[in-house]
Amino acid sequence: MGAVYTFKILKHFDIESKTAIFFTLLLTVGSNWLMTAQNAWVWFIAQNMAFTLSLMAIYYALKNKIGLSLAFWACAVGCRPFQILYLPALLYLIYNAHKAVNPEDKIIDIIKKRYLALIPMAVIALSYMILNFARFGNITEFGHNYLPEFTRSELGQFNIGYMAENLKNMFSVPQTQGGIWQYTYANGMCIFLVSPIFISYLIYIARSIIKHEKFDMKFTLLVLAIAIIELFSITAHKTMGGAHFGNRYTNDILPIIFIGTVILLPKDNDWESFNYPLFFIGLAINLVGSIMFFVQ
């Protein structure tokens, strides 16, 4: 389903089908999402759901479907709380989509006309809060703080003391022995190796600036801010995803990086070919890494 909505987002921008299929593959099987997609552990399921729900929220924001967009966003937050950071980007897309149809409307006009569309989101959020309070006596607690690895930790689940080591792991290649990479079983590895779409996004930003092309600078900066804040936030977590291959917590950022990339894609497919080796590198690393994870 996530791949379907990835393709639908690309087609919304009138990108030809061949290119749309390629970038759908780059985001999915060419990234560390390939690892999480094959695993039925409950936290992997939650992350896969957040991935798809975030893409659905983005798609319906582009289509000016406020109710659906924010409802799916609320569901994504329920799966992965840091998806709450996507809200400014969704509101920006919704605002632009509404203005394309109603150019004279101001923000207050949009609110007056469409406030009822917020009801599904509010109901979903309220249901989460009621459930959390009933189970743990706290509307924001959903059980993670009660896991043994966090209750036994002196610093708890989140602490800035974890950030330095986690940031280092996030940008480090695996250690080598005899010229061969050693398998990284936990705590993450270089995000540019396991999810090369991060490289694609940065290159397309540089391309747009170098060529002095017109692009949505506000949205580009917004996407960068969301990605950076979420990256730093997850590095404050004790485990960075526990046992897995790659760097699965950073997979939560893939949907926002994807829409940021799509916005910057040139209409003439210029520079598309540089993504091909990135895709094959991402596919090979994640395929081999995923197989080794399950056979070890």
Please identify what each model-predicted range represents.
Residues 1-296:
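Membrane-proximal envelope and lipid/glycan-remodeling enzymes
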